[in-house]
């Protein structure tokens, strides 16, 4: 692609500037500087990619999405304050869990499933973000109880985020000595967050799956999970990336044509021209594509691992694995062998969570793994 672009640039220069040696020399010098700058940027990108690949060697969580690695992002300006903030974050997490666990007739009913909080600390502000899912399937409750839960949820959200002095945000600001905001995000589907997904599975009655956990859980998951078509999703994803990169190259060629048709070849125009080329080149990488267009939108693979003693008749622990879709987002698996992009890869975004629970048969563990593209 780059050789073809270079040949097109040289051919256009030769056609438009055959009779003017000075302009040709200026164009060649400009082209040389532009290509050197592009080559330096490409080398820097290669070094970054090589460094990232070396970091993933002998790592079980290869290509793990960095967005899911942390629960607390803190500005480390004082060691004692850092420890106090971490302790406060854990207390706030427990407080929110208690608030989201509603009671009906003096019984705890996990109608609202909440994920772990994500705390983003800055010098003068704290943002607490968490996801929650309103579960309508547990205990087959009637409409009056559902209305009760929805009414309580509205009151909870008002307590957290209103501007009154007794709101939870204002109360927490006294303990943190900074502004506190709470960002609650309601999920329409349980598979959008692995933490909520694993809790949803563990909240179901595990005892009724003693006589064939694999078949019963597959039947249950088929009703709530999307019908995956990872091949078409990945193909569309790759085609969108290729189309965007082709548009970048076409914009670069159009700039070259406009510059050749322009008779004013002063230094200011040349500098603006180089800046435009640099801006286009900086936006060519996959990492700079806006997330709202392509990234983290489609679930292409999920797996669930059960480990523990779930049956009274079995004295040994058993392990059951459920897998659907794919966890490998390599481009060359779906693209043509002669594709110019076959050596690149799309970083997979794995979302992992472990949840342990105890029933009357013993202790068991549920591990959920989701792959988004």
UniProtKB/Swiss-Prot annotation:
Organism annotation: Saccharomyces paradoxus (Yeast)
Keyword annotations from UniProtKB, A to Z: Mitochondrion, Ribonucleoprotein, Ribosomal protein
InterPro entries in the record: Ribosomal_uS3m_fun
Record-level GO cellular component terms: mitochondrion; ribonucleoprotein complex; ribosome
Keyword Cell division: no
GO BP annotations, alphabetical order: translation
Record localization: Mitochondrion
Protein name (Swiss-Prot/TrEMBL): Small ribosomal subunit protein uS3m
Lineage: superkingdom: Eukaryota
